[in-house]
Amino acid sequence: MKGTEEFLSAPAENAVFSLGYDARSILTDADSVIGKMYVGGSISLKKKLATAIEDDLKVRTAAVSDSSGRGISVLVSVDAYGLSLPDVREIRQSVAGLAKEKNINSITVTVLHQHSAVDTLGMNGNIFEMALVNPAKVLFGGQTNNGKNDAYMENLKLKCKESIEAAVGSMTAGKLYYGTADQSAYLIDKRAPYVSDSSFNRFRFVPSDGSKETWLVSTEIHCVGNGAAGTVITGDYPYYAEQVIHETAGANVLFFMGAQQSTSQNRNEATVENYREDMTRLEAMKGFGESIGKSVCAITDETEVAPLLNVRYKKILLPISNPILLLAGKAGMFESLVVKNKDGVFVSSELGYIELGTDLAFAVIPGELAPELAYGGCLQGDASWSGEDWNYPSMQEMIADSGRTLRVLDLANDQVGYIIPDNNFMPMIAEESNSLELVSLGKKTASCIMGEFAALIEESR
């Protein structure tokens, strides 16, 4: 699915948006989760098995068309730490018949990257078994084990399939409105140059038949409300923001992540409902989400989005030079699509570009993008770790002649790790690193992404 074959510069005649929505639980019963399934987040030497379930985990889906005859675009948002491209492709394949019947031009599967969700990436399994036993299994053609649970993944993919079918089957015509709220007080950026999208971005769909509204909301705040090493299953702050939106506006909700690479939650009396100094992490996470929900509900300054949706995807190869990730891959900790050729070892992934209306665009990124790559402000010369300049224009600058404002859809269709400007890629042990380089494919990831994005923009014109 490459997206819309043709990019339109203006809405088609008599164009109107149509949107369908669905949400459903992906959690299996508690007995099958607690003490049996691993939790995402930071890698642990101890078995990081779930000890409790605080919140439900869901898949939420929006199916959108601009009635131009170029098909339906589907956005799937999953409460998960990460999904690799092979799993995303299985989800797409499960609805191949529907895609052909309904002319679905793209299915974008993203995650909210909760560090407290069931491990769907694989890196949080029994580290000793993965490091010591899996290599031997690979050598002799055996089945490796990691943090993923086969039954859970099968159910997750089934629920994604059902959700896509339901969203496509419930599409109705209406209008789309765009508004923002300031999110700068809610986030902490832990790494220079401290660039971010300062807004919660809300896309509010109002059906013409008076049925329930659907809100698509982006945020750049990491879902680490209960810490990265916890064992309690939670949906983090989006779960509680959604509850407030349900109660206040009665709307359907789908959150997705922007460029949230090194951000964290700034929790204090201004950003947490009923704040107390002695709050537990879970209490503070809930109050943080409730405050965000109220902020999103308070948006009043909106503009109508013209009924135009252009989508384009491109296959890309990203070189792997991080020796730790190479070893982790051999140990079965990750299930990325790896390609070897005469030039080295690569991850095969996808990169996307979306135009929404006449004023907005999205870079669709298969990992965690440094915001400065999207919006500008990369460190230059002596201010960078290498002392060298960064010579690529930002993604926003690449589309400047379109007059569109760029936003980011992060962790979409794959999880290739952190994407850091080449000239500011530093040793993993450096204090300023914040461990980003530990889970990055390597020093050339950003320049590869930027070059491919520039090519994608050119192909779209």
Residue ranges and their predicted role:
Residues M1-R276, T280-G287, T300, E304-R461:
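Conserved beta-alpha junction segments in alpha/beta enzyme cores
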Residues I292:
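Anionic-ligand-binding alpha/beta catalytic cores of soluble enzymes and soluble regulatory domains
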